[in-house]
Amino acid sequence: MAKAKFERVKPHVNIGTIGHVDHGKTTLTAAITTVLAKKGLAQQKRYDEIDNAPEERERGITINTAHVEYETEKRHYAHVDCPGHADYVKNMITGAAQMDGAILVVSAADGPMPQTREHILLARQVGVPYIVVFLNKADMVDDPELMELVEMEVRDLLSTYEFPGDEVPVVAGSALKALECGCGKEDCPWCGKILELMDKVDEYIPTPQRDVDKPFLMPVEDVFTITGRGTVATGRVERGRITIGEEVEIVGLMDAPRKTVVTGLEMFRKVLDEAVAGDNIGALLRGVDRKEIERGQVLAKPGTIKPHRKFFAEVYVLTKEEGGRHTPFFNGYRPQFYFRTTDVTGVIHLPEGVEMVMPGDNVKIHIELITPIAIEEGLRFAIREGGRTVGAGVVTAIEE
């Protein structure tokens, strides 16, 4: 039998479940697949199949993540669920699972808890743009006033971290009851709530802009000269598209971007008219000397990205067991920061009131690089010391 072809008919969206430990994130994930399976839109996944998440490595960090896929009538979803709190922190900071939106699971019986707050803060810091709330364990709350109180608390908490708390959709239900019932009917008091939640996710979380529609950017991996023709920069197109004759800027490792024109494009030794996101290409650049471009710079659509030296970032510091440092670091710590294709040395400034950072911590820091790099909010990087990864980070704000 021939392999099933992936039919790209529905728009694709990446989401995940976030929230405090034991509030029912994994149960909800299992319930979603169970209810949608009844409509022929998903493969049912049991709780233990999701809970025993496989290990993955991202930027030298081991993370346990479960990936589940399912569809609604309108969309195709890739859904991530992590077993442990540390896995969420690592996942969100490394961008191992980029989320276009998240389902925040809060137990109606307990209300918001410390990790509820922490996950909302992380979502804000790393740029998860939309949150939909599922108040779980509603079967354990008899008092409607108590339900209202918990909902208000969650909305206030979201507003505190600059999410639109008043507008965020909130659905109350019981993931466990829906999982146990599994009828998948809309008029079922439990399964119906799961379907209502997915309707809200469909409506409220917008379809993201595709990489190919974003402005062109290609990290330079290698540079060589073709005698008689000029300098070629190679790399994988990260986003956007580029055609022969277009102007681009070389950005990074120098104070001001430098303009040039792409006079030729090649992929796998074949000539191209146009390259798009995901293509591994060589770009022939007009009037650029071999010494004027190097690995660590980027080619970009003019005016879309600038070189910067100072910025704020949310970082996760690896534990000793993860191959990280054995000791804390202090203000003025000078590791290397690995952006896209290269290491750059920089100085870390800790926030006021933070004396030191321990292995296993996540913290917001200020970084000053010794040389400018093409940086924008949301850019992921690794922190390295003598060639080994000791942490991971994401740019949250640019200073200069």
From Swiss-Prot:
GTP binds at residues 19-26, 81-85, 136-139. Residues 10-209 form the tr-type G domain. Mg(2+) binds at residue 26. The keyword Kinase does not apply. Its main location: cytoplasm. It catalyses: GTP + H2O = GDP + phosphate + H(+). Residues 136-139 are annotated as: G4. Residues 174-176 are annotated as: G5. It holds the Pfam family GTP_EFTU_D3. CDD domains: EF_Tu, EFTU_II, EFTU_III. Belongs to the TRAFAC class translation factor GTPase superfamily. Classic translation factor GTPase family. EF-Tu/EF-1A subfamily. This is Elongation factor Tu 2. The lineage of its organism: Bacteria, Bacillati, Bacillota, Clostridia, Thermoanaerobacterales. The gene is tuf2.
